[in-house]
């Protein structure tokens, strides 16, 4: 990995993972896959609503925190309470510090927010400061008012829109450009340019890798987004070749003044400012969805057990058939003892209380107080139980049962009654 030394001597990986438009679950898996692939820079934002997901991916990766460069952004509707939102961001991500904190949009009281960021910087909560989507005039305004100058400006940047005038201005202050949309947005027009096909063939790379290499040689930081382990590996495989000066000049011919994919005006900024600054709302929704996902895995397990028992239970209609308890076959003479010992063949579950807990992002435990109803020898028995199920998250994000323990409780409440025939 190549590193960029910022104007405050902090070292930042030249390439990182962008998580724009990713759900908390997708951001978690993308972060995990990226760190396993060798990435050491992860970018998120308050306004992406996935910071907690990124944090889970970081924890699950096992990569030491000091080896990871985490950047995030404050949303403008929170600028007036920037100090509070800085602390909330740290708490949301479970971090002691943020490597790069960025003002996301050039609207609202960004000068007051910058002052709050400077105080957090001095307190060691932030290692570097940046601006996002700010035009040159507003960057100059921040620089003029700032005690701590920006280290980075993240803007739309790609061969169609290299932003060379802004680059020249920022170079006076040693400010690095970080490119979002480094591949020219979601369409394929940029990567289908013939020059990239030609250079890809020459270097044994893909057009995407050639474009990302162009950014590196321009001095840009880049944060392409991907959830695919294969694409992540490809995006990182750009540091073993270099484009010549003539090739860089040929790519420069693609630049078209005004060819951008993103524009914003005051009406857009007004919408940004109207967005509520409750950035935990999607995480709360994700936790609800995660709980439902784990319970669905549990229901599949219980259903499989019930299907097995009910199928086997049908055999008890034949007096010569063996007695079956939870998939275990016993001789017919054991039936009365099974009833006496309050063993059951479950046919119905009635949950009284269910608690789902996720531990260390990869282990889920379901604590369940329930009643199990059995039909034994034509009779119905109802037993109260406490069950503990433990699930492990697999590489594909699914949950696998790894242990199941149930304990019979309150035997004085045991019910056994004859059914009418």
Label for each model-derived stretch:
Residues 105-281:
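Beta/alpha (TIM)-barrel catalytic core signal, keyed to glycine-rich beta->alpha loops juxtaposed to Asp/Glu
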Residues 83-103, 119-123:
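CE4/NodB-like, metal-dependent polysaccharide N-deacetylase domain
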Residues 22-25, 45-53, 75-81, 106-111, ...:
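Acidic-and-aromatic substrate-binding clefts and catalytic sites of carbohydrate-active enzymes
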Residues 1-68, 183:
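N-terminal binding-site loop/beta-alpha segment at the start of enzyme catalytic domains
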Residues 39, 95-98, 126, 150, ...:
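A structural motif
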Residues 65-78, 99-106, 133, 354:
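A short, structured active-site edge motif that brings together acidic residues
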Residues 283-289, 293-315, 320-421:
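A beta-strand edge to alpha-helix "cap/lid" segment located at domain peripheries
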Residues 22-34, 78-93, 139:
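Short, acidic/polar
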């Amino acid at each position: 990995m190549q590193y960029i030394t910022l104007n405050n001597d902090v070292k930042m990986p030249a390439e990182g993972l962008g998580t724009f438009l990713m759900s908390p679950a997708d951001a978690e898996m993308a972060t995990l896959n990226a760190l396993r692939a060798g990435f050491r820079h992860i970018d998120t934002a308050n306004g992406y609503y996935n910071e907690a997901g990124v944090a889970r991916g970081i924890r699950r990766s096992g990569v030491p925190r000091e080896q990871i460069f985490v950047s995030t952004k404050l949303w403008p509707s929170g600028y007036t309470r920037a100090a509070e939102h800085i602390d909330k961001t740290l708490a949301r991500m479970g971090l002691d510090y943020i490597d790069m904190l960025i003002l996301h949009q050039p609207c609202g009281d960004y000068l007051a927010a910058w002052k709050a960021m400077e105080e957090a910087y001095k307190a060691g909560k932030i290692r570097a400061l940046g601006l996002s989507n700010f035009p040159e005039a507003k960057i100059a305004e921040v620089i003029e008012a700032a005690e701590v100058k920006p280290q980075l400006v993240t803007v739309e940047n790609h061969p169609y829109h290299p932003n060379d005038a802004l680059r020249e201005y920022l170079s006076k202050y040693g400010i690095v450009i970080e490119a979002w949309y480094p591949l020219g947005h979601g369409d394929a027009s940029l990567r289908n340019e013939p020059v990239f096909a030609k250079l890809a063939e020459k270097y044994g790379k893909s057009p995407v890798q050639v474009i990302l290499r162009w950014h590196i040689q321009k001095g840009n930081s880049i944060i392409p987004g991907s959830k695919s382990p294969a694409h992540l590996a490809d995006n990182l495989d750009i540091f073993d070749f270099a484009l010549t000066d003539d090739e860089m000049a040929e790519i420069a011919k693609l630049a078209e003044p005004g060819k951008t994919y993103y524009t914003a005006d005051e009406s857009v900024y007004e919408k940004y400012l109207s967005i509520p600054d409750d950035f935990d709302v999607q995480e709360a929704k994700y936790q609800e969805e995660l709980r439902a996902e784990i319970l669905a895995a549990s229901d599949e397990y219980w259903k499989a057990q019930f299907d097995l028992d009910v199928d086997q239970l049908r055999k008890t209609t034949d007096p010569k058939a063996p007695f079956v308890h939870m998939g275990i076959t016993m001789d017919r003479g054991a039936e009365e003892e099974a009833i006496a010992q309050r063993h059951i063949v479950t046919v119905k579950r009635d949950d009284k209380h269910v608690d789902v807990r996720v531990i260390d992002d990869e282990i889920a435990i379901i604590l369940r107080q329930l009643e199990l109803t059995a039909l034994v020898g034509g009779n119905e028995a109802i037993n109260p139980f406490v069950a503990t199920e433990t699930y492990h998250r697999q590489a594909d994000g699914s949950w696998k049962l790894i242990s199941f323990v149930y304990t019979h409780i309150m035997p004085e409440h045991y019910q056994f009654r004859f059914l009418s025939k």
